[in-house]
């Protein structure tokens, strides 16, 4: 049996070649590693909650909470939690989740968002200008990408079979357990085209929102 799945993303990423996306993913991961190490040392010697005041800005809602969440997710990733492993193309069988994912994909999906959140926090804390060399170039690139006007889109993937999928934690998917999950990883590379992506606002308009959970409507 074949199924329809969705991928929420940003057209900025779709306009990049696969090689460019691979390079930028490495850039983002390098920035995440740098700041995770920086703030990990900070947490060993100081109370991370002392940063709350500097990371509170009415123009950037939940800045401190997002920063803290990024630290926790990176902690779990470093500890081997496969739920937070990134790199594969993630898809969902729920249209409302694709809409939600696309609206936070402006910084290059979850990979870029983690790097972007660290860079924004570093700027607010006044430590960004301490960077130099390659890491400064990488952080600048991450910030510019995240600040570029967002273009949320949803891609529809047809004829997907369970054998093409893994669960979020990397387990095999079968026709018997496929309906027990909402988000999946594609095993193979799947080239998405910006010409077949639909602007999120239009995709959402075409969905039956009466079937959406209230918090997504």
State each model region's role:
Residues 1-84:
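ADP-ribose/NAD+-binding catalytic cleft of ART/PARP-like enzymes
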Residues 10, 14, 102, 106-217:
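Active-site and NAD+-binding cores of ADP-ribose-processing enzymes
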Residues 53-90, 127-154:
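Intrinsically disordered, low-complexity acidic Ser/Thr-rich regulatory segments
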Residues 92-94:
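Short HxH-centered metal-ligating active-site micro-motif
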